Structures are given as structure tokens and as C-alpha cells.
Amino acid sequence: MATLLSLRFRLSWLALIVLFVVGLELRYAQFGVGFSDVPLAIRGALDQLASGGNPYVPVPGSSIPPFPYGPFAVLWYLPMHDPRFQEFIVAIMATTLLAFRGEPMGLALWATAPLTVNLASDGSNDHTAAVLLLVALLVLERAPRAGALLIGIAATFKIYALAWLPPIFFWAGAGAFAAGLAGAALLWVPAAILWGASNIFATFQAADAVHKTPYFSLAEAVSRTRVHVTQSTFDILRLIAGATTAAVLSPFVRTHRGVVVAGMAIYFVTLYAGFWSTPAYLIPITLVVCWFIDDALGPPLTRIRWPSDPFGLITEAVNRRWPKVDAARIGAP
């Protein structure tokens, strides 16, 4: 009905409203369904911090899982102290942003995909990571060094955002790459000084050790052939595979789109070529794909404009102040 009305009266934005409402309803219906131990780990770290302890040192004898996230995650979840609900809000914000932009294919995919719906409130924290990554990639297209800095900051939430730094080096040069490292150091260095680098590394190792069986990974696929797999072997393999992917793809990157795609490939190989992984790691890639898919695959000028086109006005203002740059070895900040 909304589609017929939009065709008859040129109210195409009704389709955006329908998709947005469907996305909200699906997420609301699934709220609290599913389980992730991420909220337990985050709350445990926040409780430790509130009591004057170290978020990267678990309480002896406690059943709370280790906290294998960056210091930005501590700051991000501290005010609400409710990671599940906070991630649900972020998921709604991402849906709102896509609807406001008006690209129908990306909005439809994000609003209705079972992956994004089911993981909006299961407790995993990859929606926040996805939004941080998307913002950084959008800034990167206009201000490479600032965007790379934001990539580094995103890596202080979840370290896997660093997957985009190798292609950034070959696209925008050493200055942008250094900005990315500086962004990562901005919070990781103080955290290492305050809470101890050895404690942080030990927490990451303890989090890996929790997973006793391969899951959603290359190791699981191999184990289905009745070949014995060991965690240590595949943990090393995924690092080698990720580094190899970066070395093979990054030197050929010459466009912003190339940075996005190469980073996604490095990210995917590094996270899924190991012993254990999770569907939640696909959320950042999915949000990035949903943002760019209409421009990449659809016919030109498919964006649906809201009355007065506020997104278009914002885009025009941004283009005048920060035009897109898309050439290899960019020297601009």
C-alpha cells in the first residue's frame, strides 16, 4: 500500500517509513532474545572499576568472564551500566541514520536481515563498533588523516578496527597511517600505564581460553571433516592469514572504496580463519555494506528524498567545506 501511494502521489518517503517501522518492530520483538556473555564481562569490569579495582583483573573465584575490550568500551558503557539496552539503542540509531539518508536498498537490508535483527539486543557489543567504524570511514573519504585517527580510536573499543590501517597506508600515505596509530595509542597507552599492559594481555588470552570448541570459523569447518584441530594452531593461522591478506591487497589500493573493501577482507580473514568466532563480528561489515551498497550496485540517483531533503542539504554543506578526496598517496590532512 505504501509503495502504491508513493507511486501515485510521489510520496516515496513513505517506503522509508515502512522499512524503518518494520525494522523497529522486528528489533523490539526480539529484545532480550538470545544470549551473549559480553554484558557480564562489561558489567564485571565496570564493577571492578567502581570499587577501585582493575577492570582487566578478574575477581578471584568469580564466574564473570574476562573483559577483552578496549578502554573506550569502559568509558562508553560506564554512564548507563546496561550494555544490552545501550547496544539496542545504538542499533535503533543505526537504523534511523540509514532511513534519514534515504538509500532504500541499504535500509531494507539492515532493517530486515535476521543477523542484524537478532543481534540488536542479544548483548553483543558490535553495533557500537559498527557505528564507530562507519563514521571513521566516512570521515576518511574527506579528511584521510582525521579518518585514520578515528579508525585508531575505534580500535580502542575493539582492536579489530586496525584491519583498515594497512590499506590506508597505501592510499593516503604514512601520515594517515601514523594518525591511525596515534588514535589507537590515545587510550591504549594510558590504559597500559594505569592498569598494566601485562594484565591487558592476560585478559585477552584468558578470553581466548574460554572457548574450548571451534565455532563459526575455519577451524569448525575443518573439524567437520574429522581432522583434529588445536586452538593454538588456528590462533596463529588467523594472524598469518590476516597479515598475508593485508600484504597482498593493500599495495593495490588506490581509492577510498578500495580501502573499505580491502579492510573488510583483512577483517574477515583475521577473525574467521581462526579457532573461534561469532556471527556478531559480521555486524560492522554489514553496516558498512548497507551504507555503500546503493551507490555501488544500484542505478544512479536512487536516494529517496524526504520533504525539504535535509540529508541532501547537509551533504551539500559538507561537500563545500570538506570535498571528497580519492587519489593514491594523498598528502592532505
Q: What do these predicted regions represent?
A:
Residues 149-170, 273-281:
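Transmembrane helices and adjacent periplasmic/lumenal helix-loop junctions
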Residues 1-137, 141, 145, 172-282, ...:
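Primarily membrane-embedded glycan-assembly and transfer machineries that use lipid-linked glycans
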